[in-house]
Amino acid sequence: MKRALRALLSIGLLMSCQVHARELRVCADPNNLPYSDEAGEGFENRIVELIARDLGAHVDYTWWAQRRGAIRNTLNAGACDVIPGMASSSGMSGTTDPYYRSTYVFVSRADHGLQSLASLDDPRLRTLRIGVQLVGDDGANPPPAMSLARRGIVDNVRGYTVYGDYADKAPQAPVIDAVARGDIDVAVVWGPTAGYFASRAGVPMVLAPVTPWLDGPQSPMVFDISMGVRRNDRALRRELDRALLRERPAIERILDAYHVPRVPMMAVAPVPSP
C-alpha cells in the first residue's frame, strides 16, 4: 500500500513538473527549408531546440509564414517571445548577439568554368544568364538584384520569388535548380539557401562570396544573424546571449551539416551578469 502511494505521489510530482516546465515560445515559418519547417527539419529548428535544452525549456512553436508583417503580427503582438534567423541590424525588434554571419554567393555549375566569378563588377555578368531572388516590384528587393540593376545589368537577369511556391516542400529551391539544369549560368543567392540546395543539386556546384561586401550603403552582401526578441525583454535577451555563447561549437556543427557558408564574425564580448 505504501509503495503504491509513493508511486502515485511520484507520478503526481512528475506530472506537476511537466505542467510547469518552462516554455520557449518561438515563431517560425512552417515551410521554409533550410531554415525551418513544421517537421523540425530546418537548421533554425535544430538551433532553437539546442538553446531550449540549454535553458531547461521546451519549444512551443507558433507557425507563421515569413512574409511582410510577420514580426508585427507575431513577436510584437505577443504571440511568441523569440524569432530565430533575424538580421542583427533589423530595426523591427530587439536582437541577441549574432550566432553566425553569412553572405550572398555566386552559384554556378562546376563544369561551366565560372569558379573565378566573385565580383559584381566582373564584365562576364553582362552576358551571362543570371538568376536572382526577388521580393516584389516596390524597390525592396534583395541587395544583389539592386546592385545588378544599378550597373545596368537587367535584360539578362531572371527573377525567382524569394517566397517561392508555398505548395512545394522547398519553396526556395527553384533558383538553384535552374543553375543545375543549365537554364541559367549563375545565381546570386543568400548563402544558407544556396549552400543547402546546391549540396542537393545532383551535380557539382561552386559557391563564391559576392564582393564587394558593401556595395553602397543600401546594398550590404554580408549580414550577421541573431534571434529576435522584444526590445524591452532584456532578461530573455541576456539569457539567450549566454546560451548562444555556450552552445557556439554545437551551432557551428549544425551550420556545417546544412552547408551554410559563413564569413568570420567579430569577437563577442562576454555577457555581463544582470
Report the location of each language-model feature:
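Ligand-binding clefts/hinges and TM-proximal coupling segments of bilobed small-molecule sensing domains
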Residues: 58, 64, 132, 136-163, ...
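Hydrophobic residues within well-ordered alpha-helices
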Residues: 51, 74-76, 123, 178-180, ...
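Bilobed "Venus flytrap"/periplasmic-binding protein-like clamshell domains
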Residues: 30-53, 106-170, 192-193
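Periplasmic-binding protein-like
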Residues: 29-32, 101-104, 113, 159, ...
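N-terminal signal peptide c-region/cleavage motif recognized by signal peptidases
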Residues: 16-18
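A ligand-binding cleft/hinge motif common to bilobed small-molecule-binding domains
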Residues: 69-70, 76, 84-94, 180-219
